[in-house]
């Protein structure tokens, strides 16, 4: 493989299936998907964790520790070791999780340079975009580097897990690895998604709408840059702006500028809607613990923003943040039926009809999803915390996912951004953006 000035060889050392250490009882062999799960695409969401050289620990010991603790953890997370059947339920047959071990012929730090991080991510994450009927529901890849550094990556069908579920699973798996020789840690995930959003019969989920022309890049905002954006928002009249709020407004405005620059046709002066959609974790709203398993997510969105509103930075920032705050408050008061992802998408499409728009793909909608505050940087298998955590979700046009990024004892934010090629070329050259990102 090649990327820029680096060429790296990889070798697959082994592939095996890891099954739960105790068989799943027959009474638990069917795990119903929730209505939310049924309407989520069968894509693979992957998270990778890079660790410095665990001094004095043999590779064989690391492999055995990970596999044994994974097997133990799957007793509690037994649906992960099963197969999705007809977009209806998971057959919890203990087929297991695929465990792949890979050798990467380079030093880890050589590919963790900023300009090569997308390449590093592609090397260590499982080579899946969708999860087919013959695939295991989840997959693990353990990668060894020449320097002794390693990466542990976990990928799972989005139909089974959201970001909160993945964070809980990784926390439990790591804790099981640390307490492998004892019974101090017994994972207790809450498998209640179907009781919150009951499954329905004959739900057909369409194929995932990837864009072949999309590219994905990461932009890192150090803590001081985020504080500047928050201070600017306060000057604009926003009370107590959050990190995610100011970055959502800032990045969506930069995206609009880039879109105008890349567009050959400027809509002849017409001001189309420019909705900003925000994903939301429903666990706090539903008063569920964070270890609740499934797709407990939905969206809310701005209703009145037009694409030409970006011309005034102050007014645009106020409009985006205030609109999203208002809509977030509304969603907290909805019934469970109205909280589902599908119900909110239907509401979104309905909101576009006043503009005579029947397909939301015809406009520049912008999706923001925050994985900040998920404790990914606390995932310690017994040899220290990760130095970098990376994420892959299949390319969605005009999408940004935010994650915490460590700066000493503080955290900035890493924004994983996906745009079509021409728009990305304009976006990454935006002078205002470059003032805030770290190299």
Swiss-Prot record:
Its main location: cytoplasm. Keywords: Acyltransferase, Alkaloid metabolism, Coiled coil, Cytoplasm, Nucleus, Transferase. GO terms for biological process: alkaloid metabolic process. Optimum pH is 7.5-9.0. Predominantly expressed in young leaves of mature plants. Low expression in stems and flowers and not detected in roots. Confined to the laticifer and idioblast cells of leaves, stems, and flower buds. GO terms for molecular function: 17-O-deacetylvindoline O-acetyltransferase activity. Belongs to the plant acyltransferase family. PANTHER family: ACYLSUGAR ACYLTRANSFERASE 3-LIKE, F21J9.9. This is Deacetylvindoline O-acetyltransferase. InterPro entries: CAT-like_dom_sf. One of its GO terms (cellular component) is nucleus. Its EC number is 2.3.1.107. Monomer. Involved in the biosynthesis of vindoline, a precursor of vinblastine and vincristine. It is found in: Cytoplasm; Nucleus. Induction: Inhibited by tabersonine, coenzyme A, K(+), Mg(2+) and Mn(2+). Induced by light with a maximum 48 hours after initiation of the light treatment. It comes from Catharanthus roseus (Madagascar periwinkle).
């Amino acid at each position: 493989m090649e990327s820029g000035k680096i060429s790296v060889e990889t070798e697959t050392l082994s592939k095996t299936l890891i099954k739960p250490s105790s068989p799943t009882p027959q009474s638990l062999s069917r795990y119903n998907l929730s209505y939310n799960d049924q309407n989520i695409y069968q894509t693979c969401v992957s998270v990778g964790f890079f660790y410095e050289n665990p001094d004095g620990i043999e590779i064989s010991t690391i492999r055995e520790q990970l596999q044994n603790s994974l097997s133990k953890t799957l007793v509690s997370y037994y649906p992960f070791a099963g197969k999705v059947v007809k977009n209806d339920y998971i057959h919890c047959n203990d087929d297991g999780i695929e465990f792949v071990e890979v050798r990467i012929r380079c030093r880890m730090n050589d590919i963790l340079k900023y300009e090569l991080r997308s390449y590093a991510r592609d090397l260590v994450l499982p080579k899946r975009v969708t999860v087919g009927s013959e695939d295991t529901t989840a997959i693990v890849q353990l990668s060894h580097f020449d320097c002794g550094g390693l990466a542990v990556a976990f990928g799972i069908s989005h139909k089974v897990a959201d970001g909160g579920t993945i964070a809980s699973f990784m926390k439990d798996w790591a804790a099981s690895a640390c307490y492998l020789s004892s019974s101090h840690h017994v994972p207790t995930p809450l498998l209640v998604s179907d009781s919150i959003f009951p499954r329905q019969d004959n739900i057909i989920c369409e194929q995932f709408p990837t864009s072949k022309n999309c590219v994905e890049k990461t932009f890192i905002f150090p803590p001081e840059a985020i504080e500047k954006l928050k201070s600017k928002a306060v000057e604009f009249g926003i009370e107590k702006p959050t990190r995610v709020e100011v970055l959502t407004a800032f990045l969506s405005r930069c995206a609009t500028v880039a879109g105008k620059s890349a567009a050959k046709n400027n809509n002849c002066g017409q001001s189309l809607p420019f909705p900003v959609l925000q994903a939301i974790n429903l666990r706090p709203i539903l008063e569920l613990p964070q270890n609740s398993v499934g797709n407990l997510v939905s969206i809310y969105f701005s209703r009145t923003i037009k694409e030409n509103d970006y011309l005034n930075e102050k007014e645009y920032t106020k409009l985006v943040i205030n609109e999203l705050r208002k809509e977030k408050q509304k969603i907290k008061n909805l019934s469970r039926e109205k909280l589902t992802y599908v119900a909110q998408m239907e509401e979104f499409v309905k909101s576009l009809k006043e503009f005579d728009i029947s397909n939301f793909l015809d406009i520049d909608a912008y999706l923001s999803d925050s994985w900040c505050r998920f404790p990914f940087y606390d995932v310690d298998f017994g040899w220290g915390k990760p130095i970098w955590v990376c994420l892959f979700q299949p390319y969605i046009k005009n999408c940004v996912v935010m994650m915490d990024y460590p700066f000493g004892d503080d955290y900035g934010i890493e924004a994983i951004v996906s745009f079509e090629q021409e728009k990305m070329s304009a976006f990454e050259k935006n002078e205002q953006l470059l003032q805030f990102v770290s190299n």
